[in-house]
């Protein structure tokens, strides 16, 4: 192949690459539930839940998720139980507020997109005495105060 053809081919590839738009997301964070996996350990002859992994994907257009300030709690988790009339927040259980370190985008853009896994330990099941199904509802707040959509784990049996 001649040098001219290679140069033209390189120019076309470079031009097409420059035309590809970078992904742009809303400045309000968006979450999408991925998975919830409970882990158990043996206590005597009984298997007892002791931790869980909650995984969700996120997008944020202005890239201000997380914080360098360890007192800024970006992730808010609320525990719900279904006692026969649909899922209701259990007011006896304190909400969980989680610090998320400042997240940075790969590349030159400001927008963020990725997957986040939160370990719930100790036991992800708050009330072992009841047999009611439970779920967690999760929301994130960015540094500008934008609150994401609320995501929920599927109903979990105890």
Q: How does the language model describe each region?
A:
Residues 2-9:
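Sec-dependent signal peptide recognition
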Residues 15-18:
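C-terminal motif of bacterial Sec signal peptides marking the signal peptidase cleavage site
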């Amino acid at each position: 192949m001649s040098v001219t053809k290679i140069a033209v081919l390189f120019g076309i590839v470079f031009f097409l690459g420059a035309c590809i738009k970078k992904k742009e997301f809303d400045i309000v964070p968006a979450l999408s539930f991925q998975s919830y996996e409970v882990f158990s350990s043996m206590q005597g002859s009984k298997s007892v839940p002791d931790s869980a992994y909650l995984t969700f994907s996120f997008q944020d257009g202005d890239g201000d998720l997380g914080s360098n300030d360890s007192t800024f709690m970006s992730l808010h988790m609320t525990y719900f139980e279904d006692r026969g009339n649909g899922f209701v927040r259990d007011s006896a259980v304190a909400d969980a507020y989680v610090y998320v370190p400042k997240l940075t985008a790969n590349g030159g853009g400001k927008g963020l997109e990725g997957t986040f896994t939160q370990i719930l330990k100790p036991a992800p099941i708050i009330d072992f005495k009841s047999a009611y199904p439970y779920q967690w509802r999760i929301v994130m707040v960015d540094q500008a105060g934008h609150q994401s959509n609320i995501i929920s784990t599927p109903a979990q049996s105890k």
